[in-house]
């Protein structure tokens, strides 16, 4: 009877431990590894695929329907050779209607992803105001914060923005550049891996046109062995 009672308590304890957040478990077993917050801000006009991109990255599922977004934050705990990161990715809608919120998000951001749709030229043009806002807020420390210009929907044949157009814009803004497809999962995971290992340089290499089965050369050089936990 006593053994049965003990077994029941042990099972309850194990069940509770399984429900503990990964963060608490890591702190219990790896107290020597400091967990750092890393905030990535994703911005773009309505319909460019920001929410779909993040949903694809977080769950591996493609979201077909469009859901208007003001601001959402996705959280993920990552472990890599540099330590343990608490990754916070904020999906922020560009535009003048929520400029105060944008300023707050930019001030706290460690990295920025500027997303446009290759099927609509105006979505690239409208990113300029947000890029200038980042420059204004970060000021002389701008070089410390990686910025990646991302052309989404690269799988769509009806494009208005050529690969070279996006690359040229990235050169002008001195930021990294890559094209992705959230729908076909091209370069989605590589994008966020690159951000975690990206080091800002005075000059930025351009992405070479790549095959679907290959990752960009810039990403390959920056990609570290990170484990999603």
Curated annotation (Swiss-Prot):
<feature type="binding site">
    <location>
        <begin position="91"/>
        <end position="95"/>
    </location>
    <ligand>
        <name>GTP</name>
    </ligand>
</feature>
<dbReference type="GO" id="GO:0003924">
    <property type="term" value="F:GTPase activity"/>
</dbReference>
<keyword id="KW-0547">Nucleotide-binding</keyword>
<keyword id="KW-0636">Prenylation</keyword>
<dbReference type="InterPro" id="IPR027417">
    <property type="entry name" value="P-loop_NTPase"/>
</dbReference>
<comment type="similarity">
    <text>Belongs to the small GTPase superfamily. Di-Ras family.</text>
</comment>
<feature type="propeptide" description="Removed in mature form">
    <location>
        <begin position="227"/>
        <end position="229"/>
    </location>
</feature>
<dbReference type="InterPro" id="IPR001806">
    <property type="entry name" value="Small_GTPase"/>
</dbReference>
<feature type="binding site">
    <location>
        <begin position="44"/>
        <end position="51"/>
    </location>
    <ligand>
        <name>GTP</name>
    </ligand>
</feature>
<dbReference type="GO" id="GO:0071514">
    <property type="term" value="P:genomic imprinting"/>
</dbReference>
<feature type="short sequence motif" description="Effector region">
    <location>
        <begin position="66"/>
        <end position="74"/>
    </location>
</feature>
<feature type="binding site">
    <location>
        <begin position="63"/>
        <end position="69"/>
    </location>
    <ligand>
        <name>GTP</name>
    </ligand>
</feature>
<feature type="binding site">
    <location>
        <begin position="182"/>
        <end position="183"/>
    </location>
    <ligand>
        <name>GTP</name>
    </ligand>
</feature>
<dbReference type="Pfam" id="PF00071">
    <property type="entry name" value="Ras"/>
</dbReference>
<keyword id="KW-0342">GTP-binding</keyword>
<dbReference type="GO" id="GO:0000079">
    <property type="term" value="P:regulation of cyclin-dependent protein serine/threonine kinase activity"/>
</dbReference>
<keyword id="KW-0488">Methylation</keyword>
<keyword id="KW-0449">Lipoprotein</keyword>
<keyword id="KW-0472">Membrane</keyword>
<dbReference type="GO" id="GO:0019003">
    <property type="term" value="F:GDP binding"/>
</dbReference>
<dbReference type="InterPro" id="IPR005225">
    <property type="entry name" value="Small_GTP-bd"/>
</dbReference>
<feature type="lipid moiety-binding region" description="S-geranylgeranyl cysteine">
    <location>
        <position position="226"/>
    </location>
</feature>
<feature type="binding site">
    <location>
        <begin position="152"/>
        <end position="155"/>
    </location>
    <ligand>
        <name>GTP</name>
    </ligand>
</feature>
<dbReference type="InterPro" id="IPR020849">
    <property type="entry name" value="Small_GTPase_Ras-type"/>
</dbReference>
<dbReference type="GO" id="GO:0005525">
    <property type="term" value="F:GTP binding"/>
</dbReference>
<dbReference type="GO" id="GO:0005886">
    <property type="term" value="C:plasma membrane"/>
</dbReference>
<keyword id="KW-1003">Cell membrane</keyword>
<dbReference type="GO" id="GO:0007264">
    <property type="term" value="P:small GTPase-mediated signal transduction"/>
</dbReference>
<feature type="modified residue" description="Cysteine methyl ester">
    <location>
        <position position="226"/>
    </location>
</feature>
<protein>
    <recommendedName>
        <fullName>GTP-binding protein Di-Ras3</fullName>
    </recommendedName>
</protein>
